[in-house]
Amino acid sequence: MIVKSLDHLNKISEKILKKLDKKDCLFLVGEIGVGKTTLTRYLINNLQKQKGLSQTEVLSPTFNLLYEYEISDFKIMHYDLYRIKETKELKHLGIFSNELDAVKIVEWPDLIKTPLEDKLEIYLRYGEKEDERKIDFKGQGKWKNFKHEI
């Protein structure tokens, strides 16, 4: 699918949000600057708006590795694993520990090999025009057919 504007990307985030539940996992894959954090920002800000809360700034957690957002009954864990080089480093982050009743949004998920029940992989690529992006979806569990629902 070709995304022609930020408004279009925002509409896609709204469709993802309609299906999003606690414990879901979103993997964002793409080059630096392609829009992974922008999509995350839209998801978080739209959820805040939906819950009647003011919108917060959503930054890339490249240096912190993780930013957490408490949005009413939702907890969102936004990870950026760009600087992680070995799988053993992932264990220290505890991304998939069972006690985490949270949505996990993971940028640069390449090292994650844990099988997950409900996961949506979102692939972002630069389009032919400067402001275009190509986006594709690969889902597991309840996300399996999301590509056809959008």
Feature-to-residue mapping (PLM):
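Short phosphate-coordinating micro-motif centered on Lys-Gly-acidic
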Residues: 88-90, 96-150
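Conserved nucleotide-sensing/catalytic segment adjacent to the nucleotide-binding pocket
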Residues: 62, 66-108
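Conserved lysine of the Walker
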Residues: 36
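Hydrophobic anchor at the beta1->P-loop junction of P-loop NTPases
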Residues: 26-28
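P-loop (Walker A) phosphate-binding loop of NTP-binding proteins
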Residues: 31
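N-terminal pre-Walker A segment at the start of P-loop NTPase domains
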Residues: 1-15
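Phosphate-binding P-loop
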Residues: 16-23
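Post-Walker A helix-loop "phosphate-sensing" segment adjacent to the P-loop in P-loop NTPases
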Residues: 45-57, 71
